[in-house]
Amino acid sequence: MADFKDNYIHYNWHWFWNWGTGEALNNGTHFVDILRWGLGVDYPTKVDSIGGRYRFQDDWQTPDTQLISFQFGDEASCSWEGRSCNSTPVDGFGVGTAFYGETGTLFISGGNEYKITDLQGKVIKDVKSNLKFETGNLLNPSEKLDAFHFENWFDAIRK
């Protein structure tokens, strides 16, 4: 049993090993699911992870920097990168999934937003979400991905 600390609640329990798994399974798992669905694969045959707590000197225990590689036999591979210590966008997105193909790239940032570019970076299609969100609000269920998770959960209950 662990002593009560106010830093464990409400959202911050993710960063302590007794209750959470860090960013990899907090938000990372949602984007890896999108990758798996897009690649048409189920479970990885090999997983490698490197990372640690390099930037912040606080009581959180899980990595603030992490890279996980997933191998799906000879079918496909993908990687997930978590940089809680540095929010510099990758390909213009703070979070999301990217499929790099032979003729272009598909970026999915969540919340019904995606962008398709050709190999030269020319935008072929750019779809923006009509969802309003506050990036600093960690508890509001109307935030990007959470809204869809709640909708799915309620749909499952109704069935």
Regions found by a protein language model. Give the residues of each.
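Contiguous beta-strand/loop segments that form the cofactor/metal-binding neighborhood of enzyme cores
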Residues: 1-159
